[in-house]
Amino acid sequence: MVAAVQNATGVSAGVADDALVKLEVRDLTIRYGNEAALSNVSLDIREHEIFGIIGPANAGKTSFLKTLNRMDMFNSNMHVDGDILFNGLDIRRLKNVYALRSRIGVVFPLPVGLPMTIYDNVALSPRLSGMKDKAELDVIVERCLTRAALWDEVKDRLDSLGSLLSG
């Protein structure tokens, strides 16, 4: 299904007409194989503007959000054309995707892990920060899962896919 994403007419209430455009999307098309999830979407989101994306299931909302912080890179079947500028910079040309994700976050309604084990999902951030020591990672993973009240449930299946956890 192809969804049309449109910005509200005019500038949102409480946002100045001359407010800085923080996010520009131009002619964005998202495809899975030959099927378009979105086609030729263009919009501007201004500083301090509150912007919502609504639509029916399978209309391309999540696909759109994943492109904003380059989470689409985790899906080899997802092809993105068009331009996305954040603070005037093309997000596809940014070398540090983690810095981008620290500025553009996406919170999904249900927990969504990466296609890795439970252990690797929890250890991802420390590893990206340069931590390599297995003993240190083990301590961090156990501490994080304990704080999330999950340790007792998953301690014997840390090598299982995180996506297999019930929601």
Give residue ranges: language-model regions.
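ABC-family P-loop ATPase nucleotide-binding domain
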Residues: 1-29
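ABC nucleotide-binding domain signature
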Residues: 52, 66, 83-84, 98-110, ...
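A short, flexible loop at the N-terminus of ABC-type nucleotide-binding domains that lies
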Residues: 15-22, 30-40, 47, 72-77, ...
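ABC ATPase NBD coupling module
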Residues: 76-79, 89-105, 128
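Conserved catalytic motifs of ABC-family nucleotide-binding domains
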Residues: 59, 73-77, 110-120
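Conserved ABC ATPase "signature" region
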Residues: 83-90, 134-156
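The feature captures the beta-strand-to-loop junction immediately N-terminal to the Walker
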Residues: 54-56
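Short helical segment in ABC ATPase nucleotide-binding domains corresponding to the A-loop/adjacent helical element
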Residues: 69, 119-128, 138, 142, ...
